[in-house]
């Protein structure tokens, strides 16, 4: 999309995690080298790692959101829980009886689950997995009562009827599942989502940031692009530089507090 807008090729270098963020941090602040930052690299890692070699707020300028990745609280199709209310009522009645799996360790899924426990004031035993596949397998096998994972990871199993969605973690309902209530409808203000977007090295001229932000918005406004994003279990993020920057800063603070409350540390 941006290649067409700019009339020249955009070269993508895959450098996941910390190496990618360091390369982005050390690039010239001229707008020619951008980084696709995520909730993991920009907000969750700073919350759980004490010795990162970059600082989200000090080293990067936010350009534009790309996509929001909803998380879903699900139960197996044979679970007695038909709704989020059923789950909360049962968990409050018998604290510590039920467990909740996370499709990852010290990641957005993990922190979203811990944030939910805090909002709902429930005692659920957290069980971490190395990835979504193992977590879903244990949910279907009855080893865990519940699971927090991305919409993308759970949607095929929801459509097949093997697992039952109880609530979604976005502030508003999502087009992929318009009948699925949000957690926020029961616990106002709750939001626990993954996300990704463009960032530049700090010091990039504001005029350059504004131009790239405007061009990114045009790309995301294309119905075909939005459909492609939706098909991947995400929602297009139309927030520009200022609004997305405010959101990311708030996420850094929110996840740091959630990790502190849950005593989560990766190092």
What positions do the PLM features span?
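Conserved functional loop/turn residues at catalytic and ligand-binding sites
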Residues: 14, 28-31, 67, 83, ...
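An extracytoplasmic/periplasmic, membrane-proximal ligand-sensing/linker region
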Residues: 119-120, 159, 206-267
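Hydrophobic alpha-helical segments typical of transmembrane helices
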Residues: 20, 44, 83, 112, ...
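Anionic-ligand binding region
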Residues: 134-191
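Glycine-rich beta-alpha junction loops
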Residues: 40, 104, 152-153, 169-172, ...
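N-terminal (or domain-start) structured segment
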Residues: 1-58, 97, 121-150, 157, ...
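Hinge/capping helix and adjacent helix->loop/strand transition within the periplasmic-binding protein
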Residues: 26-32, 39, 47-134, 182-183, ...
């Amino acid at each position: 999309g941006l290649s067409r807008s700019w009339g020249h090729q955009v070269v993508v270098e895959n450098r996941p995690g910390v190496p990618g963020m360091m390369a982005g941090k050390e690039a010239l602040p001229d707008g020619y080298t951008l980084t696709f930052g995520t909730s993991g690299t920009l907000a969750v890692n700073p919350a759980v790692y004490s010795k990162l070699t970059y600082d989200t707020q000090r080293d990067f300028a936010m350009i534009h959101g790309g996509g929001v990745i909803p998380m879903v609280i699900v139960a197996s199709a044979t679970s007695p829980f038909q709704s989020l209310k059923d789950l909360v009522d049962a968990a409050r009645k018998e604290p510590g009886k039920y467990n909740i799996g996370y499709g990852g360790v010290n990641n957005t899924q993990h922190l979203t689950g811990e944030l939910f426990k805090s909002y709902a004031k429930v005692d659920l035993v957290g069980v971490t997995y190395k990835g979504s596949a193992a977590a879903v397998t244990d949910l279907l096998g009855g080893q865990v009562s519940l699971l927090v994972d991305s919409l993308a990871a759970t949607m095929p199993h929801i459509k097949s009827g093997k697992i039952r969605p109880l609530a979604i973690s976005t502030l508003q309902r999502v087009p992929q599942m318009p009948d699925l209530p949000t957690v926020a409808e029961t616990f106002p203000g709750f939001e626990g989502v993954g996300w990704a977007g463009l960032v530049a090295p700090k010091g990039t001229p504001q005029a350059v940031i504004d131009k790239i932000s405007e061009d990114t918005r045009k790309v995301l406004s294309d119905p075909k692009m939005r459909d492609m994003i939706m098909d991947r279990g995400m929602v297009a993020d139309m927030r520009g530089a200022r609004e997305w920057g405010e959101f990311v800063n708030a996420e850094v603070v929110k996840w740091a507090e959630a990790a502190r409350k849950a005593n989560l540390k990766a190092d």
